Amino acid sequence: MSFVAHPNIDPKSLGKVGVLLGGKSAEREISLLSGNGVLAALKSRGVDAHPFDPGLQPISELAAAGFDRVFIALHGRYGEDGTMQGLLEQLGIPYTGSGVLASALAMDKQATKRLWMTHGLATPRFAMLYANTDFDAVVADLGLPLIVKPAREGSSIGLTKVIAADQMRAAFEKAAGLDADVIAETFIDGAELTCPIVGEGPTAEALPVIKIVAPESNYDYQNKYFTDDTQYLCPSTLPDALEREVRALAVEAFRVLGCRGWARADVMLTRDGKPYLLEMNTSPGMTGHSLVPMAARANGISYEDFVMQVLAAATLDLHPNEHWKPE
């Protein structure tokens, strides 16, 4: 489906809606901001929307709440990694965004990168790090600088830019404190881009690319969400042909992972103009600093209209009629 300005969506047709926010991950604070923004947008359009925080409320209450569909505004583990999607499949409650497998794949950076590489999509070279890894050998193979990060965290949490070999151990330990799997990837020196995608399969399409200009090129957790020093360029100022190339790469990355509904591809652009995929976010931020609403606005779509269309596309991996029912 194409996302449009001023969609004709009857709020009553959406039924009773749960907005899942907060949760238990390291990105809880951002999820609360996203979820409250989504909740306010839905209520402003007359939707019968209610907050639900899995970090504070037992899952039994989710099952008993009588939601007809849910908007997943959770970020990170237990919300973006396939676990919540699997629970909602079991409950037969349609939900926004990607299904169980695509969510799990996209949350795991090494699985994502291996799949993209198999399909010939450009992504930085990488190695998995463990306590007994020969870090000097990794540096010799991949070169410096390197990015060391947890394989299953987002929002740059636990990430370190390593510029000297003797920094590897500390960078590994920082990331390993958050995830048993740690990834080191070649640092791409160039422009940071992001590109939202909406739809599914052959109907998937990219929204405008955003170019990110962060203070001292450091687009970390603080600069992503809590400062006004980062510049976001949308239109991206890229040449038209390069903008189209980045959009096409983002859409193909989305399709290869089996994503649906909406997502956001993060991309690095080398100084000679070659785009490299970094990761796919299947439950993007919807805060005041978030990028998907910005790209939507560039297409003439308000925050509220975008949220309504994401919610209207809520579905299940398995059609409700296919769910097994006891005799």
Swiss-Prot record:
Known pathway: Cell wall biogenesis; peptidoglycan biosynthesis
Keywords: ATP-binding, Cell shape, Cell wall biogenesis/degradation, Cytoplasm, Ligase, Magnesium, Manganese, Metal-binding, Nucleotide-binding, Peptidoglycan synthesis
InterPro entries: ATP-grasp, ATP_grasp_subdomain_1, D-Ala_lig_Van_CS, D_ala_D_ala, Dala_Dala_lig_C, Dala_Dala_lig_N, PreATP-grasp_dom_sf
Record-listed E.C. numbers: 6.3.2.4
Binding site for Mg(2+) 2: 279, 281
GO BP term (any one): cell wall organization
Family: Belongs to the D-alanine--D-alanine ligase family.
HAMAP family associated with the record: Dala_Dala_lig
General function of this protein: Cell wall formation.
Name of the molecule in the record: D-alanine--D-alanine ligase
Organism: Cupriavidus metallidurans (strain ATCC 43123 / DSM 2839 / NBRC 102507 / CH34) (Ralstonia metallidurans)
Gene of this entry: ddl
